[in-house]
Amino acid sequence: MNFRGVFTAIVTPMQQGCIDEASLRSLVRWQVEAGVSGIVTCGSTGEGATLSLDEQEYVARIAADEAMGRVQIIAGVGSRSTHEALSLCELLRDSGIDGLLVVTPAYNKPTAKGLERHFLTVAENTNLPICLYNVPSRTGVDLQPDSVALLAEHERIVAIKEATGSLVRATQLRANCPADFALLTGDDPTTLPFMAQGGDGCISVVSNVAPAEMLQMLASISAGQLARAGELHQQLTPLAEALFAESNPIPVKTACAWLGLISSAELRMPLSPLSQSAADQLANALSQLGRSFERSASPASSLGPGEVPDRQQAEASTLEFDLNDGVEQ
C-alpha cells in the first residue's frame, strides 16, 4: 500500500434514496483513466456519515470491483463509537479494498488517550493498512502530533490525512513521524504549501472534477517546477473556493452531475441542494477552468438508507474484537 500521490475522495451517486451503481462504476472508471493514485469511498465527500454500514461496504466493494487493481481503493471508516468502527471493518474484510481511512470519532470528544486507544484497537482488529483522518472542523476533536507519532509506531498505521489546513501542523508531523509515514493533506486550498512542508500527497475533493490538473500540480512539485505548480494552484483556486462555498459535498456533487459524471446530484438528508448563489459561483468556476457542462436543478434530498443488493449481513451484537491494544489504562 502506497499512500502517496493524488487520491480522490469520490462522491457517492444516488438515485431515489439508493446507491446508483451504474454512476458509481462510471465515476470510478473515469478516475482510473485520469491516472489518480487511489480512490477514497464514503469519507466526508462520500457522505459516509449518512450511509448505513451495509451501504458503505457496498460502495467500497463496487469501487474495488470496478477498479480491478488499477488504482488503490481506500474505504472510509467513520463512527461515533469504536465498536461501530470495528463492525464496519469486519464488513469490509472481504470487499477487495486496499486500505482504510479511519477518522477520529465524532461528537464524544475523547481525550488524547481515548483517541490513541480507538485507533490502536482498530489496527489490532484488521489486516489492512490504516490512514488516520484528522478533521476537527467536523468531528470536534483534534488528533495532536504527539498522538500521531505514537500511533505511527504501529505497523498497520502508515499515513494520516491532515485536514486542519495548518501548515505548522504539517511541519510538526514531518518532524515527529518516521520518514516512511505518509502525510496527506485533506485541505485542497493548501495542497501546494503542504507539499512544500514535506507532504506526500493529497486526498482531494477538487480531483472529482479536475483530476488532470491536480496530478499535474503534484508532478510539478515533485519535479521542482514550483512556478508551474503555482500556476496550476492559481487556476484551481476559484474551483476550490466554489466547491467549499457550502458544506462539502453539496457543491462537488452538483458539479459532477452538471459535468455528466454521475446521473444525479441527489444528496442524503440532512444535506440539502445547492443554493442559487453558490450554484452561480460554481458555474463561473467551471467556466474559468474551461469545462463544458449543463446546469440543472438539483433533486430533493432523500431520506435513505436504501436497500443494498447482495447485502452482507453481520450482527454487531455477536462480533468479538481484541481490545488488548497495548495502551496503558
Regions found by a protein language model. Give the residues of each.
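Low-complexity, intrinsically disordered or signal/transmembrane-proximal segments
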Residues: 312-313, 329
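Ser/Thr/Pro/Gly-rich low-complexity, intrinsically disordered segments
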Residues: 298-300
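Catalytic alpha/beta core domains of metabolic enzymes, predominantly
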Residues: 138-244
